[in-house]
A protein has these predicted regions:
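His/Met- and acidic-residue-enriched segments that coordinate or traffic transition-metal cofactors
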Residues: 1-148
């Protein structure tokens, strides 16, 4: 989901921060997704390729937007999504049952925290700081609820 939305933001975003964040999301999440696919494949697990209904709705809603409205909604959605991702990956890194998945979560968590911080900064800039992530500020970001 973050890859698809990141590509859309990089092309459709009107502000530089949205375009840069979107490109970072597409790049970082593509790498993480490929690594996760390799882990899953080595264990004989097939990961879902379809986006869940909630995220399909988010993609559809954003696809119908343009201009500043798109930028603001994308920023808000990415902050919310990355807040959830960081929580899920932290839980997996701390107490996951599978050592390979646990290691993947621990390795990916700092990247997601960077994305969370960047999403927070982007949201603050575009939406007047309505939400806080608790992360540190950096540059551009990346996310995908079931996958990084």
């Amino acid at each position: 989901m973050e890859v698809e939305l990141g590509r859309r933001a990089a092309q459709q975003g009107t502000s530089d921060v949205v375009k840069q964040f979107g490109q970072k999301m597409a790049d970082d999440h593509s790498k993480a997704n490929a690594e996760l696919m390799t882990i899953a494949s080595s264990k004989g697990i097939t990961l879902p390729t379809d986006v869940d209904a909630k995220h399909r709705a988010m993609i559809g809603r954003l696809a119908r937007m343009s201009g500043a409205a798109f930028d603001k909604a994308y920023a808000k959605d990415m902050l919310s999504d990355h807040n959830k991702d960081v929580s899920a990956f932290q839980k997996e890194a701390d107490s996951g049952a599978d050592p390979d998945v646990k290691a993947f979560a621990a390795k990916t968590l700092p990247i997601l925290k960077e994305h969370q911080s960047l999403a927070n900064d982007m949201n603050n800039t575009l939406n007047g700081g309505s939400k806080k992530s608790g992360g540190n500020s950096n540059k551009a970001g990346n996310s995908n609820s079931n996958q990084p």
